Amino acid sequence: MEPSVVPSWQELFGELVVLDLASPYVYLGRLVERQGDFLLLSDADAHDLRDTQTTREKYVLASRGHGINPNRRWAWVSLREVVGVSRLDDVIGD
């Protein structure tokens, strides 16, 4: 698979994104802005993977296929916890 044009991370503002955290949480939502040491998401799904039997990858793939189910109007996520950021549309399934 050949990569398409690689965006700069600032181009992710306004996009639906996946934030993988060091903890067993994954956040999905629209990346609005950076506020100091936090990323602000709107219409966010804050998902604690300890609450389900599914894996992080399966949960994100399901969200890509069926859409995000927001449980937060706004979510401020600490950059210290974020280990990865990607557009939801860039998630690759089997």
Regions found by a protein language model. Give the residues of each.
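Conserved RNA-binding domains used in RNP assembly and mRNA/RNA metabolism
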Residues: 1-94
